[in-house]
């Protein structure tokens, strides 16, 4: 058989028992020429089936060709959009603004074509650009007057973050329009520049649909720093009514302040409930049984948490954790004025009071001030006349236990602090410094200062 000949297939004759006549040969609907041809026959243009858009009364079905690349063959309706509670536009204005790119088109069933009209607010001279909001005349558009070949898509809503005085975040909505470009957002027309970091312009340019102020929580912005609605040409385009938001925020702040103030009152807790856990020894009241349990070692003297390095005991585990830093010899917190280093930042803050001359703790009896609360409490014992710490050798009494500890060095001849000039030993570093100021500092510049002294331990 030649290659140019048409392919033919012979159907075998029917069984003679069936009583059928012999079958004739049939030519197929395709050939080798058509298969090897470079060009294909054009497809017939798409013609929708008549009545496809109409509901079938018997079956109640519609032709929804949503996934087809061809135009959607369903009646065009405005898409539903749920507007937030504090949006700047009503639904009607939002719907009209979504039509600003295509116009109102002719009347009837799509007689005006697809988007042949002018923008909604093109005749307005007050607006910076075609925002679709400031048109004076109401534009009444019926669903039948919409263009026949265009899908109505709701306007994109962006979110920006504002930080009122209370520190809580408010999300303001504004239309994705060029009426307020990103440069005006960054220059403080909508939000103060204090909320923006150095990388904000690049982030806004890269992601214009999502602009999140990451440093909003860290910026303590007051209520008076918020922009006022007066400088805006369109008050309805503000990112929410700021006065109302700030008013609600002020009420919330006052309510929270009232709860905090109530917790500071005697006999009140953070949740407003009275404290009903009382210490039987000193009469101190607590709002939780756990706090009372932590308080009881003050009277019993129990120190269950013991340091494994030095053997010192503590009433609480947190105090033991802070104590362990002493044995690590790490002092990351340094004073900028004298260069002295400390283990904890709280100790550095207390040390800074010495340079500032700030003594917040003042004795009620003699008026002497102290930088630290511990020194203030120890000083008050001198006015009470009570000396409960006594030496077992000479029966000398002391107000504080560390004074007794240093006193015991006089009996065992331990003087760990030695003067580098004269070699005299002292039990306390305080006594050594006083010795140097009194005798050696007035001799001349060659005399060593307290910083040149070394501490030696004598057996």
From Swiss-Prot:
Gene designation per UniProt: FEZF2
Keyword vocabulary terms for this entry: Developmental protein, Differentiation, DNA-binding, Metal-binding, Neurogenesis, Nucleus, Repeat, Repressor, Transcription, Transcription regulation, Zinc, Zinc-finger
Species annotation: Homo sapiens (Human)
Residue ranges annotated as motif Engrailed homology 1 repressor: 27-42
Signal peptide: none
Subcellular compartments: Nucleus
Descriptive protein name: Fez family zinc finger protein 2
GO cellular component: nucleus
Region described as Disordered: spans on this chain: 1-22
GO BP of this protein: axonal fasciculation; cell dedifferentiation; cerebral cortex GABAergic interneuron migration; commitment of neuronal cell to specific neuron type in forebrain; dendrite development; dentate gyrus development; forebrain anterior/posterior pattern specification; locomotory behavior
């Amino acid at each position: 058989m030649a290659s140019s000949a048409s392919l033919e297939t012979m159907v075998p004759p029917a069984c003679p028992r069936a009583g059928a006549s012999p079958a004739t040969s049939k030519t197929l609907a395709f050939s080798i020429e058509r298969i090897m041809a470079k060009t294909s026959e054009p497809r017939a243009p798409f013609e929708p089936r008549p009545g496809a858009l109409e509901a079938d009364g018997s079956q109640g079905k519609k032709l929804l060709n949503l996934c087809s690349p061809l135009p959607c063959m369903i009646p065009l309706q405005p898409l539903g959009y749920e507007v937030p509670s504090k949006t700047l536009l009503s639904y009607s204005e939002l719907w009209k603004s979504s039509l600003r790119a295509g116009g109102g088109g002719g009347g009837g069933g799509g007689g005006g074509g697809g988007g042949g009209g002018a923008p909604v607010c093109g005749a307005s001279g007050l607006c910076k650009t075609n925002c679709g909001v400031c048109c004076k005349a109401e534009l009444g558009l019926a669903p039948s007057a919409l263009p026949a070949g265009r899908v109505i898509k709701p306007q994109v809503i962006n979110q920006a973050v504002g930080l009122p005085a209370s520190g809580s975040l408010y999300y303001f909505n504004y239309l994705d329009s060029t009426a307020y470009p990103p440069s005006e957002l960054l220059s403080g027309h909508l939000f103060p520049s204090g909320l923006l970091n150095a990388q904000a312009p690049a982030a806004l340019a890269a992601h214009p649909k999502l602009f999140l102020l990451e440093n909003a929580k860290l910026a303590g912005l007051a209520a008076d720093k918020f922009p006022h609605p007066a400088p805006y040409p369109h008050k309805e385009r503000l990112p929410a009514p700021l006065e109302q938001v700030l008013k609600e925020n002020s009420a919330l702040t006052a309510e929270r302040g009232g709860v905090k103030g109530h917790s500071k009152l005697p006999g009140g807790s953070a949740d407003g409930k009275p404290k009903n856990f009382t210490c039987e020894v000193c009469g101190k009241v607590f709002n939780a049984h756990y706090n009372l349990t932590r308080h009881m070692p003050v009277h019993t003297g129990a120190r269950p948490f013991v340091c494994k390095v030095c053997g010192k005991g503590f009433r609480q585990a947190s105090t033991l954790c802070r104590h362990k830093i002493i044995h690590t010899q790490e002092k990351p917190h340094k004073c900028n004025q004298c260069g002295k280093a400390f283990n904890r930042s709280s100790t550095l803050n207390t040390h800074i009071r010495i340079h500032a001359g700030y003594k917040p703790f003042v004795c009620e009896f003699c008026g002497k001030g102290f930088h630290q609360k511990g020194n203030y409490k120890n000083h008050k014992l001198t006015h009470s006349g009570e000396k409960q710490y006594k030496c077992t050798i000479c029966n000398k009494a002391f107000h504080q236990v560390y004074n007794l500890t240093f006193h015991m060095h006089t009996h065992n001849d331990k003087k760990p602090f030695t003067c580098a000039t004269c070699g005299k030993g002292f039990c306390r570093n305080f006594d050594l410094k006083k010795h140097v100021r009194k005798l050696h500092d007035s001799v001349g510049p060659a005399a060593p200062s307290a910083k040149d002294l070394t501490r030696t331990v004598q057996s």
